[in-house]
Structures are given as structure tokens and as C-alpha cells.
Curated annotation (Swiss-Prot):
Species of the source: Saccharomyces cerevisiae (strain YJM789) (Baker's yeast)
Localization (cell): Secreted, Cell wall
Name of the protein: Cell wall mannoprotein PIR3
PIR1/2/3 repeats (start-end): 66-84, 92-109, 110-127, 128-145, 146-163, 164-181, 182-199, 200-217, 218-235, 236-253, 254-271, 272-288, 289-307
Statement: the UniProt record of this protein carries the keyword Secreted: yes
Family that this chain belongs to: Belongs to the PIR protein family.
Any Gene Ontology CC annotation: fungal-type cell wall
Protein task: Component of the outer cell wall layer. Required for stability of the cell wall and for optimal growth. Required for resistance against several antifungal and cell wall-perturbing agents.
Prosegment residue ranges: 19-67
Single biological process term from Gene Ontology: fungal-type cell wall organization
Length: 415
């Protein structure tokens, strides 16, 4: 009987301890300030793209410069120099992560990107010729020829107006454009040599429904009576139109970043995309505005861009096994392996643990701003600093090779 009371007390103590769930110790490693209007919980996984602060400040109506961040295996977060245009749910280069949790990115080139049949985006040499696409998905340039000059009886050298190239269809169902010709040079009675206005080459369509532009040629030069040679006006490339009659602008794409096993975030060498391709095979021009629509009377009208007021993220990118995929819950960032996003002792942003790396400065206090950028406390700017072939990401300026950037949140989709 003398043991009954101590046993009851022990049972009550055990019950109360079981009901108490202590916070993870790293959740207290948070900045004192918070970002006004920032959200600390996001319903789906997302990635980040690097946006240069200097570029963003001068591009309200134009495309923003995007740099894909990557994550390598040790959890380090690093940034790429890939750029992509912004529109409603436009696509951007996703950040990649290597196995150690580092987020990294490689430099990109200015050459236009092509896509082969296995979906790889590769850099091609930039040429003046318009691109076509064959059955394996490669984008190739077509050749163009110049029309011969004609002369009538009074000595004038004239040419008829240039017309759009007719569309042909080969046996596998591909609809392709014939080579376009340049407007011939004409000469009137006072000896002036003049050129007709150039027209846009007709678009071609291959078997997957993709509408592509044929190469437009330069208008021939004209010469007025004082001997000056002048250039004729050229016309803009024709827009593409899908089966429902809508004339649309394309979303821009960029190479997705990867994550290696140590958690570092890296991006493979990528190129600036010349055009993007949506699921119906349509190649569209990169724009920041939404595509135009065509109503039944033939008028082309601009469509209004609709944005969910509760969702600050307006960019999407393809998701794959190496893409940095993060979750945000109660101000704590985790990657797909459950590692904690933190600012470590050297001020670098990377993923470790749990728990975070010993000596970590911040491991909580993350949010997404109303502008769609990742923030830590009340700070929404970070720094990409060159480290060999990649950029590491830091919350402070640590050297001459560092540049201020935003980390824009991007929704990840299966492509």
C-alpha cells in the first residue's frame, strides 16, 4: 500500500509528458522580423528561380531575367544564369540540387536552344534563317533564295509583289512551307531602283500540330534619283494559330536545375530558350503578356490575364528527380529528402539534417512574399557568389564575385 501513491504520481507525470510535443530546436533559429504580407505555409511543393535585382528593377513591362538555381547532394543552393520571360504561370528554369544539399547553377550561353526527340534542350548556332522542326523534334534552319529581276520594254526593271510561300504536305502528314523568296528590285523611268514591300513567309505545320514560321527574307534595296540606296520596309513574322482560332503568344521555357545526392543545388549548362513548346506541339513566341484571342468576326483581341489573388506564385517549371523541390510549413523549408533549409555559419543557403548543420544561423522564418519571392525574415534579397563553374547562394554579400538576386518561387509540374 505504501507504493500506491508514488505509482499514481509517476503515471500522471508520464501522461503529461506524452501529451507535450516539444518544438524542433532549430525552429527557434529565426530572424526577429517578418516580411509584411508574406505567407509561411504553401500548399504545394515549389522550386526557385534566380532573378537579378538590377534587371528586375528596370523590367516592369518586359520579361524578367531568371537564373535557375540548382541543389547538389550536400544541400548547397547555387544559382544559374539562365533567363526566361515572365507571364501568367509562365515557365522558368527550376533550381537543381545535388546530393550534399548545395544549390548551384552553371553559366548559360546566348545561342538559341533546340529540342531533340528525347526532350533535351541543346544550344544551336544562331543563324538568320527561320527554324523548322523535323520528326525527331530537332529544330533546323531552312535555306532561302532570291528572285530574279525582270525588265520591261521601256528599260524599267520591275518585280511583282512578293507573296507568301505555299504550304506543302509530305507523305507522313507533315505540312511544311516552301522556301520563301525575296522581293525583286524594280526600276522606274527616272532610273530609280526600288523594291517592293516584303511579306511574311507562310507558316508550316508538322504532324504533331505544331505551327512554325518559315524563314522571312530581307527586302531588296531601292535607289532614288540622287543615287542613294535605301532599304525597303520589312514586315513582322506571322503569328501562329491553333485549331480553335486563338492567336497566342508562347510561354518561355528554360532548362530545369538538378539536385545531387549531397543536397547541393546545381544547374547544368543551359542556354537561353528561343521559343517554348506547349503540350499540343505549338511553338510560341516568348512574351510577358497573355496571348491574343480571335473571335468569330475575325478580330484579334487581347485576353485579360487572370491571377489568383491568394497565390503569389505565377511561374511554373518542369519537375524531375534532380530539381530542387521544397515545401514551406510554419516558416520552415524542407527539400524532397526532408532536409532543413538553413543559412549556415558561412552565410550560405543549403539543406542539411535534420537537424541543420552545426552552427547554423537561421533554420526558420522563411516565407513567400506577395511578389512571389522567397524571403527570410523581412529580407527578400539574397546573393549569388561565383564558386568555380557555379554560383552559391548566400544571405549576405561576402565578396567581389557576389551579385544581389531574388529567389522567385516557381510551381513544379510533371512534363
Amino acid at each position: 500500500m505504501q507504493y500506491k501513491k508514488p505509482l499514481v504520481v509517476s503515471a500522471l507525470a508520464a501522461t503529461s509528458l506524452a501529451a507535450y510535443a516539444p518544438k524542433d530546436p532549430w525552429s527557434t533559429l529565426t530572424p526577429s522580423a517578418t516580411y509584411k504580407g508574406g505567407i509561411t505555409d504553401y500548399s504545394s511543393s515549389f522550386g526557385i528561380a534566380i532573378e537579378a535585382v538590377a534587371t528586375s528593377a528596370s523590367s516592369v513591362a518586359s520579361s524578367k531575367a531568371k537564373r535557375a538555381a540548382s541543389q547538389i547532394g550536400d544541400g548547397q543552393v547555387q544559382a544559374a544564369t539562365t533567363t526566361a520571360a515572365v507571364s501568367k504561370k509562365s515557365t522558368a528554369a527550376a533550381v537543381s540540387q545535388i546530393t550534399d544539399g548545395q544549390v548551384q547553377a552553371a553559366k548559360s550561353t546566348a545561342a538559341a536552344a533546340s529540342q531533340i526527340s528525347d526532350g533535351q534542350v541543346q544550344a544551336a548556332k544562331s543563324t538568320a534563317a527561320a527554324v523548322s522542326q523535323i520528326t525527331d523534334g530537332q529544330v533546323q534552319a531552312a535555306k532561302s533564295t532570291a528572285a530574279a529581276v525582270s525588265q520591261i520594254t521601256d528599260g524599267q526593271v520591275q518585280a511583282a509583289k512578293s507573296t507568301a510561300a505555299a504550304v506543302s504536305q509530305i507523305t507522313d502528314g507533315q505540312v511544311q512551307a516552301a522556301k520563301s523568296t525575296a522581293a525583286a528590285v524594280s526600276q522606274i523611268t527616272d532610273g530609280q531602283v526600288q523594291a517592293a514591300k516584303s511579306t511574311a513567309a507562310a507558316a508550316s505545320q508538322i504532324s504533331d500540330g505544331q505551327v512554325q514560321a518559315a524563314k522571312s527574307t530581307a527586302a531588296a534595296a531601292s535607289q532614288i534619283s540622287d543615287g542613294q540606296v535605301q532599304a525597303a520596309k520589312s514586315t513582322a513574322a506571322a503569328a501562329s494559330q491553333i485549331s480553335d482560332g486563338q492567336v497566342q503568344a508562347a510561354k518561355s521555357t528554360a532548362a530545369a536545375a538538378s539536385q545531387i545526392s549531397d543536397g547541393q543545388v546545381q544547374a547544368t549548362t543551359s542556354t537561353k530558350a528561343a521559343a517554348s513548346q506547349i503540350t499540343d506541339g505549338q511553338i510560341q513566341a516568348s512574351k510577358t503578356t497573355s496571348g491574343a484571342s480571335q473571335v468569330s468576326d475575325g478580330q484579334v483581341q487581347a485576353t485579360a490575364e487572370v491571377k489568383d489573388a491568394n497565390d503569389p506564385v505565377d511561374v511554373v517549371s518542369c519537375n524531375n528527380n534532380s530539381t530542387l523541390s521544397m515545401s514551406l510549413s510554419k516558416g520552415i523549408l524542407t527539400d524532397r529528402k526532408g532536409r532543413i533549409g538553413s543559412i549556415v555559419a558561412n552565410r550560405q543557403f543549403q539543406f542539411d539534417g535534420p537537424p541543420p548543420q552545426a552552427g547554423a544561423i537561421y533554420a526558420a522564418g522563411w516565407s513567400i512574399t506577395p511578389e512571389g519571392n522567397l524571403a527570410l525574415g523581412d529580407q527578400d534579397t539574397f546573393y549569388q557568389c561565383l564558386s568555380g563553374d557555379f554560383y552559391n547562394l548566400y544571405d549576405k554579400h561576402i565578396g567581389s564575385q557576389c551579385h544581389e538576386v531574388y529567389l522567385q518561387a516557381i510551381d513544379l509540374i510533371d512534363c
